Amino acid sequence: VFIETLGNPNSDVVDIEKIANIAHAHKIPLVIDNTFATPYLVRPIEYGADIVVHSATKFIGGHGTTIGGVIVDSGKFDWEASGKFASLVEPNPSYHGVSFTKAVGPAAFVTKIRAILLRDTGATISPFHAFIFLQGLETLSLRVERHVQNALKVVEYLNNHPQVENVNHPSVSKDPEQQALYKKYFPNGGGSIFTFEIKGDAQKAKD
C-alpha cells in the first residue's frame, strides 16, 4: 500500500494508523511518501508505516541544487511471514543464491535495494551531492517551521479574499474528518503546499 502523508496537490491528510492496520491485517507493508511533510512535521514510522520515502530534492536539500531520494526501512515488517514477497524469501541466483529474509530478517527489503538494485542501476548519489543534502538537513527544522508560518499567512489571506472560491490546505479544511486528522498528525502545522480555486471561469481569472 502506497500513500502520501500530505496528498499532492491539495495536501489532504491521511489516517496513517488506520491504513497501517488495514495493510498489516492483510500482511502487506505500508509505504509512505513523506516529501511534503518532512520528518519535522510527522514521522510515519511512529504511526505504523513500514517504509518511508522522500524526494530529497525538495525540503531536505532545500535549495534545488541536487536530485536525490531517500528510503527509510523501519525494519519491522516480517517479509517472510507475509508470504507475498518471493523475491525476498527465495534464493536469489544473481547474488550467490542468498535468501534475503534468511540472511538479514526484517532488513531484507533495504538489503536487497543495496545489493541488487544499487548494483544493477547505479542509483546512488555522489559524495558531493550527499554533502549538500546533509547541509540541508542541518537547517531542515528551522526552514520547515518558517515555511509553515509563511504558508499560513498566505492561506489566511486567500481564504478571506472575495475572489477566491476555496483554499485547499489542512489548516482551513471544512471537513470534520480532515480537521481531526490534522490535529492528530500535524501539531507543528500542515506543511506549506496548498492550492486554491478562484471564483468564475478561466476568462474571469485572466481578467
Predicted regions and their residues:
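Conserved PLP-enzyme active-site core in the AAT-like
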Residues: 1-161, 168
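Conserved small-domain helix->loop->beta segment predominantly found in fold-type I
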Residues: 121-124, 130, 139, 151-207
